[in-house]
């Protein structure tokens, strides 16, 4: 317990990783899949009606031609892949969660959709002049550190054909992330563990960096404790333009979200469509 207190008493260094991977944990990934598929909540994926509106906007704004090849980075259970494939586009989805991909493959087979799903880390993308468009939805871009974002943008640029577009969304610099802490206990099957466990959660903010961290310490009945971290970089328009330009992109569209809501300086989220130069 003393060691755990000492670990949690310190503020983590920016983008310091957690003590275990979150997305590949077998139990957590199954619970995450359930959250993705819950139509009543935006906890992991957006609600079906929102996804439908986003896909409408993306098809128009990305100027996708019939049969265009599209890459979905961090595709999860394939909700966007399925919606786009049903419209006649050729989809490839990449995700690190085996549970989500197993569901996505089964759903595609049952629907007769020829989606290609790849099990892997999208940060290791290695394709060349392949896609007309790429997607990275639900703020995944801001989870990555500065070097990882820069490297990923270069890889996406390389994977796109000349003039190809990249659409993604992020949390805005206008969003407020106050520091807080809370705890919860479960005697049975919970999100983090299948047996009894305690969860100590806190949000740490670094306002000078427009960065925050959600930290979860999961304590099992044996006393074993594991700390998980999810980082969230917040972005201004200027920062986005700078990072995109460094990787060979031009910012074409900036909205408040992927349904095309007009952007204002008070918007808490930003959606971007950038074109490969």
PLM ranges: what are they?
Residues 1-23:
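N-terminal auxiliary segments of SAM/dcSAM-dependent transferases
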Residues 48-66:
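Conserved alpha-helix/loop element of class I SAM-dependent methyltransferases that forms part
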Residues 97-99:
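Conserved SAM/SAH-binding beta-strand->alpha-helix loop
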Residues 150-162:
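A short glycine-rich, Lys/Arg-flanked "PGG" loop and its adjoining helix->strand segment in the class I
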């Amino acid at each position: 317990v003393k060691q755990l207190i000492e670990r949690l008493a310190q503020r983590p260094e920016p983008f310091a990783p957690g003590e275990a991977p979150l997305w590949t944990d077998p139990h957590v990934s199954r619970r995450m899949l359930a959250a993705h598929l819950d139509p009543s909540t935006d906890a992991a994926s957006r609600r079906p009606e929102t996804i439908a509106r986003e896909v409408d906007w993306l098809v128009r704004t990305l100027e996708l031609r019939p049969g265009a090849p599209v890459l979905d980075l961090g595709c999860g259970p394939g909700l966007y892949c399925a919606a786009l494939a049903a419209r006649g586009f050729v989809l490839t989805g990449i995700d690190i969660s085996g549970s989500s991909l197993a569901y996505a493959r089964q759903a595609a087979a049952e629907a007769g959709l020829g989606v290609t799903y790849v099990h892997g880390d999208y940060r290791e993308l290695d394709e060349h002049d392949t896609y007309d468009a790429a997607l990275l939805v639900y703020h995944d871009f801001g989870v990555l550190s500065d070097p990882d974002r820069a490297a990923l943008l270069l890889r996406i640029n390389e994977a796109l054909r000349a003039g190809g577009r990249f659409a993604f969304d992020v949390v805005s610099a206008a969003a407020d992330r106050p520091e807080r802490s809370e705890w919860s206990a479960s005697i049975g099957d919970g999100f983090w563990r299948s047996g009894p466990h305690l969860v100590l959660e806190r949000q740490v903010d670094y306002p000078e960096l427009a960065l925050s961290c959600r930290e979860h310490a999961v304590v099992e009945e044996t006393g074993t404790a594991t700390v998980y971290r999810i980082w969230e970089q917040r972005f201004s328009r200027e920062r986005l333009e700078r990072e995109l330009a460094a990787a060979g992109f031009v910012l074409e569209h900036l909205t408040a979200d992927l349904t095309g809501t007009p952007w204002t300086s008070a918007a808490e989220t930003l959606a971007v469509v950038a074109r490969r130069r």
